[in-house]
């Protein structure tokens, strides 16, 4: 049986893109030094989570993978350290805008792109203003260390996401996430959120990160 060590990065994000990327790099290096082989960064870590307000100027934050500074930096870092890094970013593809993840293999190459399927829309998650529902479908990738599936944040509430990736042969499931509970409810939703993830892990007999 193969053993794979994974890490999940949690960090405070500011409005300074360069500062956020530098902080992410520092934490990836620390995780790699501790032996992690697959290192998950948070959802949309380049900026503060901007989806709580509708601002047309925020559309300018979207880029292609080739133009995205975080994707480029993490490609170089993955190749240097020999680690796999799923990188969340705001993607522009033609006239469409997506909440996406570039799965970067340990040689720095991009295995592929996943675009978030389930897009929330309420007072504090105005994501439908910013993102088109993804058109990639759920996917898995053979990386240097494991066959992995990647969803994004709100996808975690839906069991079919995890099940589809499990049936495609995923060995590990990753869900980069910006928010883990509802900020405006009187009752903390974090335990419900965590129980959903535990359910995905138990039902599909694999770790969920």
Residue ranges and their predicted role:
Residues 63-84, 153-209:
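CN hydrolase (nitrilase-like) catalytic-core segments centered on the catalytic cysteine
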């Amino acid at each position: 049986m193969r053993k794979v060590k994974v890490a999940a990065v949690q960090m405070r994000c500011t409005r300074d893109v360069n500062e956020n990327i530098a902080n992410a790099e520092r934490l990836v290096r620390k995780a790699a030094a501790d032996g992690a082989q697959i290192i998950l960064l948070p959802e949309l870590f380049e900026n503060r989570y901007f989806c709580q307000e509708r601002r047309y100027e925020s559309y300018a934050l979207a880029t292609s993978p080739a133009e995205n500074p975080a994707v480029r930096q993490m490609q170089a870092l993955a190749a240097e350290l020999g680690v796999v890094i799923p990188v969340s970013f705001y993607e522009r593809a033609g006239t469409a805008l997506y909440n996406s993840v570039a799965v970067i293999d340990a040689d720095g190459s991009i295995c592929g792109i996943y675009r978030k399927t389930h897009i929330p829309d309420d007072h504090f998650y105005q994501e439908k203003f910013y993102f088109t529902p993804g058109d990639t479908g759920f996917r898995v990738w053979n990386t240097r260390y494991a066959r992995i599936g990647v969803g994004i944040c709100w996808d975690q509430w839906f069991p079919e996401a995890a099940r589809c990736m499990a049936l495609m042969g995923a060995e590990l499931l990753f869900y980069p996430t910006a928010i883990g509970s509802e900020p405006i409810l009187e009752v903390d939703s974090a335990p419900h959120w965590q129980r959903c993830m535990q359910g995905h892990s138990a039902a599909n007999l694999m770790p969920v990160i």
